[in-house]
Design a protein with these regions (language model features):
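N-terminal accessory beta-strand-rich subdomains and adjacent acidic, glycine-rich linkers
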Residues: 1-122
Length: 122
């Protein structure tokens, strides 16, 4: 079963014994929140990281569901692209979701280039 907590923009994938939880934070980043024993959905919240500096990137601390290459991400990325003008930075923005027949599709688009990404869950 999959359900969406609209007020917090959080998705919960539920099995008999577990929850897999991720969501879209206030800045539009996709963030992994929990995988494990079922919890009360009220317990799922985004942790804000505010002490960013040149040696410590908040994007490196965020456990993103999908980590695109670019910005201040210094760890291994899940998505890399090179656009026609040579740019290799991907700036994904959340554009919406579709939940139908217990299949979830979460959509993102690049802020500057014609790239669309959809994550699928069943």
């Amino acid at each position: 079963m999959i359900f969406y907590l609209e007020e917090n923009r959080i998705f919960v994938l539920e099995t008999e014994n577990t929850h897999y939880v991720f969501g879209i934070d206030s800045a539009g980043y996709n963030r992994h929140l929990h995988w494990g024993a079922k919890c009360d959905p009220a317990d799922y919240a985004f942790t804000e990281i505010g002490d960013e500096n040149s040696n410590h990137s908040m994007l490196d601390e965020y456990r993103q569901e999908l980590t695109p290459f670019g910005s201040t991400v210094y760890r291994t990325c899940d998505l890399k692209a090179q656009f026609a003008d040579g740019c290799r930075e991907v700036a994904l923005c959340y554009t919406g979701y579709r939940l139908k027949d217990d299949t979830l599709r979460v959509a993102f688009a690049d802020a500057y280039y014609p790239l669309q990404v959809r994550l699928g869950y069943r």
